[in-house]
């Protein structure tokens, strides 16, 4: 995969100091309410929440509600289920077009975590910052919308509506909806002892985008310049941006091919938080143990140099539009990892076996000294794919 031409504000008649990420104080899915707080807030919704499976012509129609990536609701007309999710994030990169693509990929990822590969409809939720000038709004927001639209089209769906409001911070998100037969989705609750855990995107996106901003902040750059070069940071940033914009659709399809038992996507709670949430949903008495952490090259060293302020080694560092964490039969996992790299799926797809499923009490943990897998950037050095609509 090639790098994009860097977004140049002056090409859009904007001040050269324009930065999209300055229109928010939080980044990406770092906006999530902490898990323990969220669970308390949702208690009243869960008290009377009917979540038992239903029957249709003798077949079980699964139901999934509050607590996981999507809802799965059996429809009144029988034999079909509504699978739906909503999500939104704040700007994490300064390229508006790519930010739109990332926001769309992030919404769709919740469907893909269910093994759903076809989305019937999308809505876009857009918060336009009231701190933007008219020129900034009129130049930047259409690029974001175009990126969102293009990613939706790549996913085989379309944006048919939504809501746009004024807000102090820019907000980007949407709703993804599909109607499925039971064989078109995989319930996230069937992991068994002996399964292995597979991850389909490297960790460290939040670190990469943060340290990229530090290039302009000498007091912060001085903390890490002995462990990373400016070129390392630029490559990690480009790799993070491309990974976040990449759909998890291929992995969702391969979940069916290789008999996945459960999955979730890795976003604002970090890999450990999402692994713990997935473990709680299991029907069997199992626990997840993570031994390996695939991380964007040099970002583990950066995290350590910062006193692990990002929580990367502890698995608590937020990710935005991260990969899928999939429970696969041991005998299928290596084949999954090999297949997803096939050129027929396009460039950039990767996967790693990172842990095991063992008999336990529905918890997840990372071992004390996990193996760090340094994931080299796949982006090329040339610049291609300029942002649509730029003036020369």
Curated annotation (Swiss-Prot):
Activated by phosphate ions and by potassium ions. The active site is at 31. Its cofactor is Mg(2+). SUPFAM superfamilies: PurM C-terminal domain-like (SSF56042), PurM N-terminal domain-like (SSF55326). The modification N-acetylserine is found at residue 2. The record marks 32 as: Important for catalytic activity. This is Selenide, water dikinase 1. The lineage of its organism: Eukaryota, Metazoa, Chordata, Craniata, Vertebrata. The gene is SEPHS1.
